[in-house]
Amino acid sequence: MPRPGRNTYSDQKPPYSYISLTAMAIQSSPEKMLPLSEIYKFIMDRFPYYRENTQRWQNSLRHNLSFNDCFIKIPRRPDQPGKGSFWALHPSCGDMFENGSFLRRRKRFKVLKSDHLAPSKPADAAQYLQQQAKLRLSALAASGTHLPQMPAAAYNLGGVAQPSGFKHPFAIENIIAREYKMPGGLAFSAMQPVPAAYPLPNQLTTMGSSLGTGWPHVYGSAGMIDSATPISMTSGDYSAYGVPLKPLCHAAGQTLPAIPVPIKPTPAAVPALPALPAPIPTLLSNSPPSLSPTSSQTATSQSSPATPSETLTSPASALHSVAVH
């Protein structure tokens, strides 16, 4: 059966697949690449059947563009008007259709994984895209469209990207090689060492002289620490953190520590309380003997004055002091 002519496809569905229709539209372009809107326009202008139910077949066509390796996506340059990327045929799918007929497709074009890993394949694809870009530029120049000047590096699709000289501040190289600095601007190694919790041997004399001025009753006028024999310690007596490993003593036979602990001073004797007046015993002496149980004790206290010790120890005197106060 002979193939029907193009003009007989008026309202009938054409015998072309979506892949054939897309390839036909791309091959008809001088630049060999078209945006998606131009592909739609070509199909609807050529085949009236696709002027209806556009949403259904356009979704199917987009699905074929995305999931078939025979189509490649080319990003649009920033200086080009419009939106959306361009679609082109893969350079290796030239023999996909038998004898150049879009009605017969030999087999499904598939890019092997080894082709993705081969170094020559990306270079061939980049060279093809560069040629297509040059063809498009020449076509635009022939039509008189003015394009802004772009650097040559923008069209160098096959070149190898140069490594950037910028290094992230948190990269592992910068973290390892960075010299940590304090907020004041000084390096950490230039800071003064932190004093240890225990005094070093060369600080004992200074501490002793300062303590001697504050505790004269312990150290005397000249200071006990100044008259003591100087302490000689080796480097093994102290650890790396300044903590003494041996007890600090003046000599082998002495038990007095190098920094004496202040001794609590002996409290002075409490002065005796003065003799209390006896107005209450006078009142009690005037009362009857039956009502004053302490009349005998009152007479004794009036005849002989009480000593300070008796005043503190006698219960009767304690009662008198409470009554007076």
Curated annotation (Swiss-Prot):
Task: Give expression by tissue.
Answer: Expressed widespread in the early developing ventricular zone of the neural tube and later restricted to areas of the spinal cord, hindbrain, thalamus and hypothalamus. Expressed in epithelial cells of developing and adult mammary glands.
Q: What is its main location?
A: nucleus
Q: Annotated region Disordered: where?
A: 284-325
- DNA-binding positions are 12-103
Organism equals Mus musculus
Free-text disruption phenotype from the record = Mutants suffer perinatal degeneration of the medial and most of the lateral mammillary nuclei, as well as of the mammillothalamic bundle. Mutants show no deficits in hippocampal-dependent tasks as contextual fear conditioning and social transmission of food preference. They have a highly specific memory deficit, restricted to the performance of spatial working memory tasks with no impairment of spatial reference memory. Female mutants have lactation defects with mammary glands with incomplete lobuloavelor development and morphological defects in the inferior colliculi of the midbrain.
List all membrane-crossing ranges. Answer: none
InterPro entries linked: Fork_head_dom, FOX_domain-containing, FOXB1_B2_FH, TF_fork_head_CS_1, TF_fork_head_CS_2, WH-like_DNA-bd_sf, WH_DNA-bd_sf
- Pfam families the record matches: Forkhead
- Biased segments, Low complexity type: 284-309
One term of GO molecular function: DNA-binding transcription factor activity
Q: What does this protein do?
A: Transcription factor expressed by neural progenitor cells in specific regions of the embryonic neuroepithelium. Essential for the mammillary nuclei maintenance. Negatively regulates the proliferation of oligodendrocyte progenitors and promotes oligodendrocyte maturation. Also expressed in mammary glands, plays a role in lactation, controls development of mammary glands and the inferior colliculi of the midbrain in the central nervous system that regulates the milk-ejection reflex.
Keywords linked to the UniProt accession: DNA-binding, Nucleus, Transcription, Transcription regulation
Indicate where this protein resides in the cell. Answer: Nucleus
Q: Name one GO cellular component term.
A: nucleus
Which GO biological process annotations does it have?
A: axon target recognition; cell migration in diencephalon; epithelial cell differentiation involved in mammary gland alveolus development; floor plate development; hypothalamus cell migration; inferior colliculus development; lactation; mammary gland lobule development
Query: By its UniProt entry, which SMART domains does this protein fall under?
Result: FH
**Protein name as annotated:** Forkhead box protein B1
